[in-house]
Regions:
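Catalytic core of membrane glycerolipid acyltransferases/transacylases, capturing the structured
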Residues: 61-134
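A generic local structural motif
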Residues: 37, 52-57, 86-87, 142-144, ...
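Helix-to-loop junction immediately C-terminal to a conserved catalytic motif
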Residues: 41-73
Length: 297
């Protein structure tokens, strides 16, 4: 099957993404944007009602390679919750952030390019092309992710499910896709699982909820980070598609183990047992409000 050529919009989107993610100067500027601009609005729209457990645990890690954050996927804004947690920790190893996304919208629509630029400084990279005729582009994206994970300080935020769960039960997962397993087994990063619950898909409504007087009790966004996933036994095997799927399933299994703790925390919030002065509320962390400074080991 012949490779489908990129459209003019896709070429423009890729040039912008490479300028802000591959070029070191562009990545430096992007990081300043995320820490100085995105941080302001994400914090204003989320931090008041966001509770994070396990943050001090991941702050204590000393990665010698890149880190892959894997989480469930219910909201368009899940990755921003993880970004905010890393910046407000502050997590010292989260120096350069990358959020792989499907090419649909963000790379094939003018508005998608604008959203990626204005909201994330271009950090929604690399794009995943799912069409069969774009397989070579998809393979190149996977190779790029593997390459990124070789460098300490690089963090990839990924959803093993591949797409948002839209069912009525927020604790139910879609099947894990093998791509995330392939990237991990070839890149060999530290893999940190997280379970996130409480975000919606309407940014205006989410910000309004954050400003409400009962934001924490009625609309808490709870994130639970777990310890790094042990997958050494899988890395010892010969890479193959079945093994990629097995790795992805293991990552989602570890994410799933965090659901019970999230339910316990939510019950404590609703009952008043977990009070507003608890240090796990992000707004209670002693960090700057105007700029997210890098943490120290």
């Amino acid at each position: 099957m012949a490779e489908a050529p990129l459209t003019r919009i896709e070429r423009l989107a890729l040039r912008f993404a490479e300028a802000t993610n591959v070029d070191p100067r562009g990545k430096w500027l992007q990081t300043r944007f995320l820490r100085g601009i995105s941080y302001l609005w994400v914090r204003a729209g989320l931090a008041n009602r966001m509770l994070v457990e396990g943050l001090d645990g991941i702050m204590a890690l000393r990665p010698e390679t890149g880190v892959m954050l894997v989480s469930n996927h219910r909201s368009f804004f899940d990755q921003y919750a993880m970004l905010l947690a890393c910046y407000m920790g502050p997590v010292h190893w989260s120096k350069r952030l990358f959020f792989p996304v499907r090419s649909n919208f963000f790379y094939d629509q003018p508005l998608g390019i604008v959203v990626n630029a204005v909201v994330a400084g271009g950090a929604m990279y690399p794009p995943i092309f799912r069409q069969a005729e774009r397989r070579a582009l998809n393979d190149a994206a996977l190779d790029k992710m593997v390459e990124l994970l070789q460098t300490p300080g690089n963090v990839l935020g990924m959803h093993p499910e591949g797409t948002r769960g839209k069912g009525p039960d927020p604790y139910e997962f879609l099947p894990a896709q093998p791509g995330v397993g392939k990237v991990a087994l070839l890149g060999k990063p530290i893999v940190v699982p997280a379970f996130i619950h409480g975000l919606g898909n309407n940014i205006v409504q989410d910000i309004a909820w954050n400003l409400g007087s009962e934001a924490r009790k009625s609309r808490a966004v709870i994130t639970v980070f777990g310890p790094p996933v042990d997958y050494d036994d899988l890395m010892a095997e010969k890479p193959r598609p079945a093994l990629y799927k097995k790795a992805a399933d293991r990552f989602m299994l570890e994410v799933g183990k965090l659901r019970a703790r999230e339910k316990e925390l939510r019950a404590q919030v609703n009952s008043g047992e977990l009070t507003d002065d608890d240090p796990r509320w992000l707004d209670n962390r002693p960090v700057g409000k105007l700029y997210a400074r890098e943490g120290k080991p």
